[in-house]
Amino acid sequence: MVYEEEIAYISSRIRELRKEKHLTVQELAYRCDMERSNLSRIEAGRTNLTIRTICIICSALEVGLRDIIR
């Protein structure tokens, strides 16, 4: 897969930020208006992310895009 390391990094940052905010996968998924299983796949790095999806997650976490990709 192309960009495996980058996808893994972004996925782990999403998980890390979610935990810092004391949110469950279900709670963040609700804030993002997505299924819990979809967010679980994102955090596990098992799906390709779009910029739109990353921005939705950033908004739900109340962080900037830079906080996810730094």
Write out the residue ranges for each language-model feature.
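Short C-terminal boundary/hinge segments that cap the last helix of small helical domains
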Residues: I51, E62-R70
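A detector for short, charged/polar N-terminal pre-domain segments
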Residues: M1-Y9
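Recognition helix of helix-turn-helix/homeodomain-like DNA-binding domains
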Residues: D33-T47
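Conserved hydrophobic/aromatic packing and binding residues within compact polymer-binding modules
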Residues: I14, L28-A29, L39-I42, I68
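Short, basic-rich loop-to-helix N-cap that marks the start of a DNA-contacting helix
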Residues: R46-I56
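Short basic helix-loop element that most often maps to the first helix and adjoining turn
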Residues: S12-Y30, I56, L61
